[in-house]
Amino acid sequence: MCVSIISNTIINLILGGSSNDSANQLLFESYLNKDLIFMFIQSVILAPVLEELLFRGLIFRSLRSINRNLAFFASAFLFGFLHIYSALFAGDLTQLVYLLSYGGMGFVFTYTYEKRKTICVPILMHMINNLVAIILLVFM
């Protein structure tokens, strides 16, 4: 969460103080207007479990035996890319700056996975991060 806040602040400074939101955040906000329960289940339960199993449990673990640095980079970069790819393919190249934020979170989750030797901790961190994001969107 701290990584996200710091990197989003840097991004806003780079963009000249713009308050542009990431495509991922805009998607969250669109769900808020439709079905909060669906958004909660998808964002706080399903996405963290599936994303951590894919990026830490499969990608990082598979690549770590080949090259630890490559494993960290691939896991974090692909995690970040997942959160912006739809906007990029729609032509919004400004979303590239959010690779810093999402990739940073991916790095923190990967580091935690490696140090704790369990996928449960980054899953829980990811769940808490997404829950805090939803709470902030609902009450702000």
Regions found by a protein language model. Name each.
Residues 5-9, 33-140:
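Transmembrane helix-loop-helix hairpins at the membrane interface
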